[in-house]
Amino acid sequence: MKILLTGATGYIGRALVAELVRQNFIISAAVRQKNSLFPNEVKQFVVGDFERNPDFSASLVEIDCVIHLAGKAHVIDKAKVSVLKGFHKINTELTLNLAKQAAMAGVNRFIFLSSIRVNGNKSTKPFLEDDVPNPQEPYAISKH
């Protein structure tokens, strides 16, 4: 199976790359810039700045599955409107753009990892699959 991975340099992404390579999947990583830390087995596609809604078409050729981990977790400008806009651009618009491009390229599966934060900030018991999302802050809203 040929997999395109975004967010491959992040915390989860690095671990996932190692495991997928170990299991002999064919991995491509859509990255902002080349990264020398990837194993040689990982093909890198430089798509540039994710805030500019990049064209992923070259990286989607012959891909069976997209695993989308990339996202914005921190914004420096703390004005609430700016923060939400910054998160929305990457966590919502980029995700939708990539999903549309993947569908147009004939990709069979699109896996998107979100965040537990979409369920709210506090709970005294574990969240359940049928719980209604209750995002409380701009990051969580953008991941919902």
Show the residue positions of the predicted features.
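SDR active-site strand-loop-helix element
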Residues: 6, 30, 66-72, 110-115
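Conserved Rossmann-fold NAD(P)-dependent oxidoreductase catalytic core, especially the SDR/UDP-sugar
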Residues: 96-139
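Short, glycine/serine-rich, charged loops/turns that create anion-binding
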Residues: 34, 74, 117
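N-terminal Rossmann-fold cofactor-binding loop
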Residues: 30-35, 49-50
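Residues at the starts of beta-strands that form the adenosine-phosphate
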Residues: 2, 26-27, 108-109
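Active-site helix of classical SDR
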Residues: 142
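N-terminal Rossmann NAD(P)H-binding glycine-rich loop of SDR-like oxidoreductase domains
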Residues: 3-23
